[in-house]
Structure formats: C-alpha cells, structure tokens
Amino acid sequence: GIPCGESCVYIPCTVTALAGCKCKSKVCYN
C-alpha cells in the first residue's frame, strides 16, 4: 500500500483512517 504519513505505534490511525488507511507495521497505509 501507500504510506499515509501517520504512524500507529502508540495510537491507532486517526485522521488518515478517515481516508481509508489501516495500520500495518506501525505505519498507516492506504
């Protein structure tokens, strides 16, 4: 996928999750 520019190490994807991004390997991917 495409990195969304948001990490999800301590907290889940927030803003990018609204764009359909999901957490993978501590980074939010689309």
UniProtKB/Swiss-Prot annotation:
One of its GO terms (biological process) is defense response. The keyword Signal does not apply. The keyword Disulfide bond applies. Keywords: Disulfide bond, Knottin, Plant defense. SUPFAM superfamilies: Cyclotides. Belongs to the cyclotide family. Bracelet subfamily. This is Cycloviolacin-O18. It comes from Viola odorata.
